[in-house]
C-alpha cells in the first residue's frame, strides 16, 4: 500500500508534527501531536472520529463470496481503490477489484489507481470540456511524469511547468516537448510561447497558493491575443480554465485580472470526477491502467 499526499492529509490533518510524541507499546504504538488553535475550527468535526487511512492497495484474494464473479477472483492478484487499505485484510466488492496482469506483483500494482487515474482524468477532463492541450504544474512529480508519457503516446500538447533547472532536464530527457522553468527570468515569455505552440487553454495546478494560477491565465490570454483577428475590450472569447488540485503552497491564491472575462478557476479532485463520469467510463480508464501498468 502506498502513501499518497491525500493519505498524509488524512493521517495528520492540521497537526503540527514538530510536537509529535510516541507512547503506547511496540505492538500498539500511539503518536500524539498538537493542533494549532487557529486550525481547530476546521478540524472540529473530526474530533473523536475514527478515520481509516489508505486510498489504494493491492494483494492476493484469499476468500470470496458465493457469486461467480467473486469466486473467479480467488488466488488472483488484484488492485483495489476503496479506502481503509492500511490493513492486513480488506473486504471489498468484487466489481471494485482490478485483476492485475499475470506476473505483476502486489507491490507493482499497489499504486496503479490514484496517480494513473488522476493523470488520465486530467486528459479526460480536457477532452470533455473541449480543450485540445493542457498545462500541468509541479510537472516533475511522479504524477507529472505519468501525464507526460500519456500525452506523448496520445499526441496531446502538454506544457510542463517546473521550479528548477534539474527538473526541466529530467522531463526533457523523457521526451517532454514543452517545459517551462518558473525560476527562469524568462518564465512568463517562455510560458506564453509554449501556449502559442500547443494551444493549451486548460491547466491543472498542484501548487494552489501564490501567483502561478493567475500567471497561467494571463499567459493564456496573451497567447490567444497573438492570433486574434479583432480587438475586444473584454478580452478573448476563448474560455481559459485553471483547476487547482493540490496545495503545495498553502498561502492565498493571488490573481491579477489581466486575462479578460472568459475564464474560470476551481478545484478538481479525482473521486468526484470519477463519480461524475459514471461506471462505464471509469472502467475504461481502469482497463487502460491495467494494460499499461508497466509502461
Model segments located where?
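Glycine-rich beta-strand-centered segment in the early N-terminal region that forms part
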Residues: 1-2, 14-82
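Cytochrome P450 core scaffold surrounding the K-helix E-X-X-R motif
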Residues: 5-11
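Short helix-loop-beta connector
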Residues: 73, 102-105, 127-134
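A structural motif shared across PLP-dependent enzymes of the aminotransferase-like
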Residues: 82-94
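C-terminal boundary of histidine-terminating zinc-finger modules
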Residues: 107-109
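Adenosine-nucleotide cofactor-binding segment
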Residues: 153-231
Amino acid at each position: 500500500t502506498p502513501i499518497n499526499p491525500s493519505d498524509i492529509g488524512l493521517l495528520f490533518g492540521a497537526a503540527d508534527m514538530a510536537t509529535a510524541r510516541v507512547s503506547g507499546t511496540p505492538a500498539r504504538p500511539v503518536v500524539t501531536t498538537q493542533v494549532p488553535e487557529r486550525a481547530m475550527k476546521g478540524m472540529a468535526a473530526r474530533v473523536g472520529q475514527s478515520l481509516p487511512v489508505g486510498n489504494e492497495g493491492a494483494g492476493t484474494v484469499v476468500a470470496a463470496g458465493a457469486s461467480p464473479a467473486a469466486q473467479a477472483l480467488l488466488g488472483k492478484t488484484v488492485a483495489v481503490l476503496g479506502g481503509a487499505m492500511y490493513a492486513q485484510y480488506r473486504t471489498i466488492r468484487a466489481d471494485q477489484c482490478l485483476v492485475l496482469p499475470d506476473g505483476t506483483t502486489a507491490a507493482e500494482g499497489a499504486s496503479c489507481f490514484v496517480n494513473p487515474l488522476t493523470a488520465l482524468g486530467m486528459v479526460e477532463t480536457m477532452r470533455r470540456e473541449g480543450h485540445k492541450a493542457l498545462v500541468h504544474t509541479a510537472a516533475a512529480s511522479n504524477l507529472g511524469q505519468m501525464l507526460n508519457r500519456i500525452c506523448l503516446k496520445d499526441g496531446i500538447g502538454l506544457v510542463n511547468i517546473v521550479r528548477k533547472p534539474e527538473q526541466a532536464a529530467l522531463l526533457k530527457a523523457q521526451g517532454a516537448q514543452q517545459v517551462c522553468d518558473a525560476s527562469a527570468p524568462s518564465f512568463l515569455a517562455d510560458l506564453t510561447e509554449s501556449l502559442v505552440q500547443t494551444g493549451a487553454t486548460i491547466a491543472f495546478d498542484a501548487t494552489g497558493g501564490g501567483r502561478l494560477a493567475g500567471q497561467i491565465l494571463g499567459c493564456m490570454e496573451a497567447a490567444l491575443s497573438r492570433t486574434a483577428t479583432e480587438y475586444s475590450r473584454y478580452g478573448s472569447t476563448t474560455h481559459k480554465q485553471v483547476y487547482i488540485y493540490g496545495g503545495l503552497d498553502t498561502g492565498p491564491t493571488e490573481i491579477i485580472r489581466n486575462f479578460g472575462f472568459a475564464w474560470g478557476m476551481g478545484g478538481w479532485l479525482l473521486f468526484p470526477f470519477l463519480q461524475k463520469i459514471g461506471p462505464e467510463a471509469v472502467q475504461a480508464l481502469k482497463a487502460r491502467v491495467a494494460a499499461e501498468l508497466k509502461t
